[in-house]
C-alpha cells in the first residue's frame, strides 16, 4: 500500500535503508498492526468488539440529526437520548415547567421510528412519573433489559441541588433525602396485534388506543437516605422482567408481566415455593460447595453448607447445635485462636446454617419444612420474617369509582404503584385472578429487610457477635446477579459499635468499627444465606463519608477484578441525560451493533 503522508514515506524509506530510521519504521508499522491484532484477540477473550476499531463509519450510515428531524421539534426542546437495542427506534424526551418557582416539571418520552433515508417518524408519546410534583430537573436514565424488548424502565433521580432553602421548604425535606421516580412503559409494537386492532375499532381515530400488553404504564416513587444507594443498572436489570430497587431500608425485587384471562401458561416469576431444594440426598443445598459456581466470578469465601449426604436436622437438634457451637466459639476465642480459625465445621451449626424461619426467635419450632416433605407441604411454608411478598393483578374496569381503595391501604411495606393505559385510565388492583376478562398486568414484589438480615447474620455467623452492641448505619452494594439461579449477591457495609476484643486490657467502652457482610438472596425461595463476614476494623478519625467512599471503591474493585463479560446481546442498554447536566451535549447517537450514527 502506498504511504499516505510524508512521515510514512520517510518511515518507509528508512525501512528500506535498514538504518536507524528503518528500525523505527518497522516498530511503528509493527505497533499499529500489533494493536489491531491485540484488539481482535481481546474480542475472543471478552466476547465484545471494541468500537474504537471502527470509529470512521461509512457515510451511508452516518446522518445528521438536522436532516431527519423537523426544526419545530428541536425548538420544542427535545433532548435525544439514543437508539433502542433493536435499532428500530430513537428515543427523546422533553421537560417543561412554568415560569415561577412553584411550578412542577413535566416529562414526556418519545419513540421515533428510524430509517436511514427518511425523516424520523413519531410513533409514541407518553408522560412519565404520572402526576408527581417534581420541583427540579431530574437526572434521567432509560434502560432496556437484556432480552425483554417489550418494555423500558425510566429512572428519575432528584439530587436536591436546586434553589436550596425554597426547595427544602416546599418538599419538607433536607439534603439527606432524595426522591427516586420510576416509570415502566410498554414499547410500541412492530405491528398491530388482534387486541390492538380491537382497541382501535372501539376508539377510532385515537392513536393511543392499544391493548394492555402494548400500551401500559406503571409508575412509582420512593425516597432514599444517606448514604444514597448506588445506581447499578447492569445488575439491577440483569434478570429479564425483574428490577432490583434499593430503597435504603430494603431490597425490593419487582417483576412486571402481562397476561390474558384464561391463559394456562401463567408463571410466577418471584418467590416460587416449589423451587425449594429437592429431597434426594445427592442434591446439594443452594450454597454447598457443589453449588458454589452460581457466582464463579467473585472468588469470595462461601460459608459451607451442610454436607449433601447428611439428613436435615430437626428444629430441636438445630437449636441444640447452635447452643453448643456458641460455646465452642467462645472457648476458641478465649484461647486466643485467630479469627479465621474460629469458623466452625458445618456440622456444628450457626456458621453453616441457612436462615430458615425455624431459626427466628419468635418462630415456632414446627415451621421448618423438611426436604423430604411432600409438595403440598412446601407450598404452604410460611414466609421468613425478613421478607414480604405481594402479588397484585391490575385490570381495566369500565365503571368509575369501583376500585376498593381501602383493601390495599394497610400495606406499608410494598412500593405503591399506579398503573394506567396510554389513554390515562387507571387500572384496578386485584389480589385474585378470578372473574378477569381480557388482558391484565401482574406486579410481584419480594422485599428483603436489611436490618433484619444484619441482625440475623451477626447473631448466627459473626465470630465477633459477642462484642457487638449496635449498628449506626449501613450501605448496600449489589455484587452479582445470576439470572439462571435467581441468586443475588449483596455486600452490606456496616458502621457499628462493639466492645474491643478481650485481649485489649482496660477497654470497657465500645468503639466504632467498620465491617462488611456478604449475603446471597434466593429470589425463588426468599431465603438468604451468609457468604462471608468481615473482620472488625476500627474507625479512627474518619468521617462517615470517607468510610463509605473507601467501602464502595473496594466493591467496585472486587466486581471489576472478577468480571466475566456478557455476550454482545446480553447487556442492559442505558441512555441518560447526564451530558445535559454537565452543560454539554453528546456528539453522536451511536448504534454500535449496526454501525449507525446520528450526528448531533
From Swiss-Prot:
Keywords: Immunity, Metal-binding, Phosphoprotein, Ubl conjugation pathway, Zinc. InterPro entries: DCAF15 (IPR038914), DCAF15_C (IPR047319), DCAF15_WD40 (IPR032734). This is DDB1- and CUL4-associated factor 15. The gene is Dcaf15. One of its GO terms (molecular function) is metal ion binding. It comes from the Eukaryota. Pathway: Protein modification; protein ubiquitination. Residues 1-29, 334-384 are annotated as: Disordered.
Amino acid at each position: 500500500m502506498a504511504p499516505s503522508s510524508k512521515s510514512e514515506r520517510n518511515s518507509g524509506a528508512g525501512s528500506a535503508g535498514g538504518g536507524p530510521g528503518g528500525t523505527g519504521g518497522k516498530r511503528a508499522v509493527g505497533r499499529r498492526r500489533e494493536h489491531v491484532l491485540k484488539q481482535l484477540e481481546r474480542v475472543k477473550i471478552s466476547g465484545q468488539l471494541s468500537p474504537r476499531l471502527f470509529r470512521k463509519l461509512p457515510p451511508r450510515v452516518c446522518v445528521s440529526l438536522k436532516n431527519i428531524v423537523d426544526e419545530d421539534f428541536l425548538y420544542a426542546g427535545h433532548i435525544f437520548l439514543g437508539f433502542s437495542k433493536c435499532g428500530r427506534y430513537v428515543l427523546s424526551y422533553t421537560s417543561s415547567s412554568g415560569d415561577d418557582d412553584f411550578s412542577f416539571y413535566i416529562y414526556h418520552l418519545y419513540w421515533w421510528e428510524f430509517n436511514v433515508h427518511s425523516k424520523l417518524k413519531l410513533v409514541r408519546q407518553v408522560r412519565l412519573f404520572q402526576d408527581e410534583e417534581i420541583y427540579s430537573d431530574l437526572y434521567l436514565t432509560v434502560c432496556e433489559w437484556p432480552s425483554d424488548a417489550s418494555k423500558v424502565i425510566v429512572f428519575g433521580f432528584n439530587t436536591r441541588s436546586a434553589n436550596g432553602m425554597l426547595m427544602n421548604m416546599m418538599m419538607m425535606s433536607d439534603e439527606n433525602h432524595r426522591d427516586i421516580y420510576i416509570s415502566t412503559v410498554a414499547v410500541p409494537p412492530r405491528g398491530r396485534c388482534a387486541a390492538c386492532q380491537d382497541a382501535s375499532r372501539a376508539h377510532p381515530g385515537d392513536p393511543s388506543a392499544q391493548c394492555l400488553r402494548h400500551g401500559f404504564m406503571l409508575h412509582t416513587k420512593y425516597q432514599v437516605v444517606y448514604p444514597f444507594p448506588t445506581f447499578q443498572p447492569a445488575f439491577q436489570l440483569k434478570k429479564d422482567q425483574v428490577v432490583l430497587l434499593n430503597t435504603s431500608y430494603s431490597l425490593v425485587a419487582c417483576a412486571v408481566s402481562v397476561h390474558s384471562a384464561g391463559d394456562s401458561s401463567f408463571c410466577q416469576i418471584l418467590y416460587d415455593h416449589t423451587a425449594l431444594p429437592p429431597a434426594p440426598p445427592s442434591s446439594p443445598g443452594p450454597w454447598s460447595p457443589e453449588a458454589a459456581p452460581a457466582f464463579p466470578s467473585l472468588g469470595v469465601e462461601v460459608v459451607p453448607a451442610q454436607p449433601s449426604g447428611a439428613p436435615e436436622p430437626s428444629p430441636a437438634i438445630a437449636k441444640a447445635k447452635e447452643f453448643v457451637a456458641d460455646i465452642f466459639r467462645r472457648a476458641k476465642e478465649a484461647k486466643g485462636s485467630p479469627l479465621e480459625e474460629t469458623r466452625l465445621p458445618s456440622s456444628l451449626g450457626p456458621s453453616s446454617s441457612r436462615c430458615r424461619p425455624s431459626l427466628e426467635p419468635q418462630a415456632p419450632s414446627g415451621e421448618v419444612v423438611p426436604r423430604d416433605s411432600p409438595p403440598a407441604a412446601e407450598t404452604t411454608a410460611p414466609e421468613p420474617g425478613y421478607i414480604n411478598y405481594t402479588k397484585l393483578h391490575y385490570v381495566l374496569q369500565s365503571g368509575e369509582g369501583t376500585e376498593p381503595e381501602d383493601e390495599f391501604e394497610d400495606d406499608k411495606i410494598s412500593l405503591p404503584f399506579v398503573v394506567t393505559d396510554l389513554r390515562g385510565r387507571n387500572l384496578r388492583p386485584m389480589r385474585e385472578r378470578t372473574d378477569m376478562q381480557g388482558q391484565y398486568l401482574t406486579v410481584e414484589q419480594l422485599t428483603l429487610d436489611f436490618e433484619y438480615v444484619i441482625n440475623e447474620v451477626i447473631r448466627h455467623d459473626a465470630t465477633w457477635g459477642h462484642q457487638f452492641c449496635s449498628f449506626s448505619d449501613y450501605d448496600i452494594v449489589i455484587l452479582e446477579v445470576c439470572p439462571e439461579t435467581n441468586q443475588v449477591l449483596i455486600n452490606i457495609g456496616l458502621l457499628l459499635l462493639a466492645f474491643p476484643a478481650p485481649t485489649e486490657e482496660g477497654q470497657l467502652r465500645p468503639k466504632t468499627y467498620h465491617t462488611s457482610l456478604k449475603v446471597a438472596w434466593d429470589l425463588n425461595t426468599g431465603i438468604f444465606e451468609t457468604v462471608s463476614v468481615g473482620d472488625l476494623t476500627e474507625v479512627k478519625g474518619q468521617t462517615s463519608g470517607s468510610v463509605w467512599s473507601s467501602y464502595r471503591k473496594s466493591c467496585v474493585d472486587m466486581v471489576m477484578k472478577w468480571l466475566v463479560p456478557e455476550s454482545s446481546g446480553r447487556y442492559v442498554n442505558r441512555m441518560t441525560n447526564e451530558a445535559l447536566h454537565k452543560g454539554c451535549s453528546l456528539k453522536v447517537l451511536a448504534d454500535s451493533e449496526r454501525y449507525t450514527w446520528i450526528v448531533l
